[in-house]
Amino acid sequence: MDRALRLLARSRCLSRVPASAPGPGPGSSPSGVSRLLLRPPNAARMASQNSFRIEYDTFGELKVPNDKYYGAQTVRSTMNFKIGGVTERMPIPVIKAFGILKRAAAEVNQDYGLDPKIANAIMKAADEVAEGKLNDHFPLVVWQTGSGTQTNMNVNEVISNRAIEMLGGELGSKKPVHPNDHVNKSQSSNDTFPTAMHIAAAVEVHEALLPGLQKLHDALDAKSREFAQIIKIGRTHTQDAVPLTLGQEFSGYVQQVKYAITRIKAAMPRIYELAAGGTAVGTGLNTRIGFAEKVAAKVAALTGLPFVTAPNKFEALAAHDALVELSGAMNTTACSLMKIANDIRFLGSGPRSGLGELILPENEPGSSIMPGKVNPTQCEALTMVAAQVMGNHVAVTVGGSNGHFELNVFKPMMIKNVLHSARLLGDAAVSFTENCVVGIQANTERINKLMNESLMLVTALNPHIGYDKAAKIAKTAHKNGSTLKATAVELGYLTAEQFDEWVKPKDMLGPK
């Protein structure tokens, strides 16, 4: 029986040997079978460990992938905050902003005595972070500590290990460049993360949001001028009102976008104030006199934006009213764009059963069942963006209100939503401009028909026959389905000649 069991075990081992297994080499055991039998049971696990290195934080050792520059604290964060997946990672603009900040801090720290060799390596590695060359080494999600400490350490570890590599050292050794002692020198997560937030927000506003809104403003302004001589009926409460020009109607949209740009720019001076130098609670512990001012100046030079040190670091760490203010300006912008997009799609409704005063560009098929149907898709996309921005602002508002004592602890969520709003509004403004606004045409035949049929032209008679008689004309004409002119003459309130003289749409476009 024992012999049978041994034979069975041997046959099972033989079945596990791959056909391509190499023959015995010098000094090897006599067969592939014996090599397999002699291999320790955890050999596969040990072999897989070759792709990892061991790093340490204050809680102990962790395995870190050899192809990543981050370290133990980043790995621990990925273990502790498995929330949302890849789509919820810290926004890349924040990571790039950290690269700018860490470079500036290293340069200033060198002025205060940091070894130039270490400082230069940090600066080079930080530049790579700022340029987006190391994006794959930042796996952390937004949903972490409210101060952003894990992301600050992720940045410190990546820059440290990349700098170590540049200097020919061993990844994970923290020598000669230490993530805390050197990369994070004179800094705390409590002041670096809000600094990165402001840098990221300012860059996004200048690179995406303001250019997009300016493009939309200019296109709407061009349409306002193009439509300046087209007289149409106005509408209030969605009901017919007195005339105006299509150009005047569009001029309202132009002014809304102009004010949106003005509001956003007005919020920026507070965004340009940087918390760097406040360290843990705003006192500047472990920094040198002048560090905060010098870092802000370096960041300004690196970005070309007028950053300055925050005049009060306690406010800069504990409250993020500046981000709430900027988000509020974007929320107002979203309200404006919602109105503009809705007006344009309603004025373009039809083509035969709607208002039909505007002819909108036809960009793609609109229905999977109704042949030939085309929809106002750019308007719909813009209104959805507006709704999202409004929702983002609610989250930012709640986050901004949660500054507890010396620290706000909703930082990652706040900047995620601020950046999301800025990017969405900027991109949507460009898309709406290029794919809708520039191609809008006026349907003058339809506009003239609706204007001539409107009962509200009777308003021009008020100064001549009084409100009550004018109202009687309008109501009688509506009830009988007759024209204003015929009804006015029939009621004996005026002659046909008087009606033609007093009721002229072109004379109803402004004060006299």
Curated annotation (Swiss-Prot):
Entry-annotated residues carrying Phosphoserine: S368
GO BP field: arginine metabolic process; DNA damage response; DNA repair; fumarate metabolic process; homeostasis of number of cells within a tissue; malate metabolic process; positive regulation of cold-induced thermogenesis; positive regulation of double-strand break repair via nonhomologous end joining
Positions where Phosphothreonine occurs in the chain: T87, T238
InterPro entries: Fum_hydII, Fumarase/histidase_N, Fumarase_C_C, Fumarate_lyase_CS, Fumarate_lyase_fam, Fumarate_lyase_N, L-Aspartase-like
Pfam families: FumaraseC_C, Lyase_1
PTM-bearing positions, type N6-succinyllysine: K63, K68, K82, K117, K124, K294, K469, K475
EC number: 4.2.1.2
Listed pathway(s): Carbohydrate metabolism; tricarboxylic acid cycle; (S)-malate from fumarate: step 1/1
One GO cellular component term noted in the UniProt record for this chain: chromosome
Residue(s) at site: Important for catalytic activity: E380
Active site: H237, S367
Record: residues binding substrate: 147-149, 178-181, 188-190, 236, 368, 373-375
UniProt keyword terms in alphabetical order: Acetylation, Chromosome, Cytoplasm, DNA damage, DNA repair, Lyase, Mitochondrion, Nucleus, Phosphoprotein, Transit peptide, Tricarboxylic acid cycle
HAMAP family in the cross-refs: FumaraseC (MF_00743)
Miscellaneous comment in the UniProt entry for this protein: There are 2 substrate-binding sites: the catalytic A site, and the non-catalytic B site that may play a role in the transfer of substrate or product between the active site and the solvent. Alternatively, the B site may bind allosteric effectors.
Protein function: Catalyzes the reversible stereospecific interconversion of fumarate to L-malate. Experiments in different species have demonstrated that specific isoforms of this protein act in defined pathways and favor one direction over the other.
Similarity comment text for this entry: Belongs to the class-II fumarase/aspartase family. Fumarase subfamily.
Record note on quaternary structure: Homotetramer. Interacts with H2AZ1.
Name the UniProt record assigns to this protein: Fumarate hydratase, mitochondrial
Origin species: Sus scrofa
